[in-house]
Amino acid sequence: MPVLEIDKEYLYSLLGMRLSRDELVEILEDTKVNIEGFSDESIELEITSDRLDLLSTEGIARMIKGIIGKELGIPKYPVEHREEELVVDESVKNVRPFAVGAILLDVRLNDSVIKSIIQCQEKIHETLGRKRRRVAIGIHDLDAVKPPFRYIARPMDEVKFIPLGENREMTAREILENTEKGREYGNLIRNEEGLVPLIEDSMGRVMSMPPVINSELTRLSERTRNLFIDVTGTDEKSIRTSLSILVHSIAETG
């Protein structure tokens, strides 16, 4: 089962209050999480498979607020359905067939929020995602690109972009052969046609090559205010559940 590392100061900021060690332990021991570690700075919690909504610090904060009576009931967030924002092309059918997306506006990111979002993303990859085989998530700076977006498969030698963490443009083949993420996850999209799945913006710029790596183009920073999230995979129910978990977690940041 996944183990989540909780930054206590960030947790307190989400709660809007501080709790003593004894109070936190008492609350957590009455829930479906197991305390694996507890220090002055952080808490390590093992999350059970039936509470994947707790795969983030924000999810833990939401649960605690309900237990202590600070916020009761199911949280409600303003939602606008914009189906035109992500078009799924027929070419991905035999590569990695399903994709969903969401846009989140006016998000306030700082180091703690970014770390928490990325941790939630990776925990989803490990659990529901089956190490990205079933589900993979990309999180992008919306203001760096132009919607609508397209999920499409193209020949790997015709695809070029700067992968996240690199400083030069590479072909998709080079990324799969020469980068750490490419070697680790490239086997998940290998096919006889030599196609790779891509998320592109309306100008044809590559945002990600799921489930392998994002583009440097949409890297998150503390200046990022608007997000686009893509979730791709081989099981439609799992990608929708994963998107819901992550979007609700980010919404809790305010």
Residue ranges of each PLM-predicted region?
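RNA/tRNA-interacting regions in translation and RNA-turnover enzymes
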Residues: 1-254
